[in-house]
Amino acid sequence: KQPQTVEPRSTDIFTYPLVHMTGHGNVFFSEEDAQNLRKYLISGGFLHIDDNYGMRPYIEKELKKVFPNQELQELPADHPIFSSAYNFPEGLPKIHEHDGERPQAFGITYENRLILLFTFESDLGDGWENAEVHNDPQQVREKALKMGANIVKYAFEN
């Protein structure tokens, strides 16, 4: 089955408990997108944004439309999302090298619930693609898949 897509402004977003977003650069949320996405997230939805490279400046700017009074906060390595199914004692694993920077996980919380996860300098999605696409070793792909399982489990349980 093909992955489903949904627009941030669509009411269909409320049928998905978890939404995954990825890309390489320019992201823009209209006011309608931002309002609907905020409503989705504070109503129980979860958004994982995986920076495939180049999204961070756009995401930081556009998330200000969604949550004008909140900043992305770096998650500590002992955050439960790193141990919900598989243990990552160092936090977010590094999957794909772009420029040698350390992987970072950022979040936005609402009423003590992590509602948005932004993974940066990790590129989990590369490890989720077919092995032939990036020629990643099996252990790298397994780390990506296990971290993905952690994200899904955490999102469904919190």
Regions of interest found by a model, annotated:
Residues 1-7, 49-52, 70-78:
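Surface-exposed patches in mature extracellular/periplasmic domains of secreted proteins
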Residues 1-18, 22-25, 115, 123-124, ...:
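Aromatic-Pro/Gly-enriched surface loop or interdomain linker
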Residues 2-8, 30-35, 100-104:
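Alpha-helical scaffolding within the catalytic cores
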Residues 11-15, 41-42, 107-112:
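Extracellular/periplasmic catalytic domains that process cell-envelope and extracellular macromolecules
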Residues 23, 45, 63-71, 155:
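Sec/Tat-exported extracytoplasmic proteins
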Residues 56-130, 140-149:
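An acidic, glycine-rich "communication" segment
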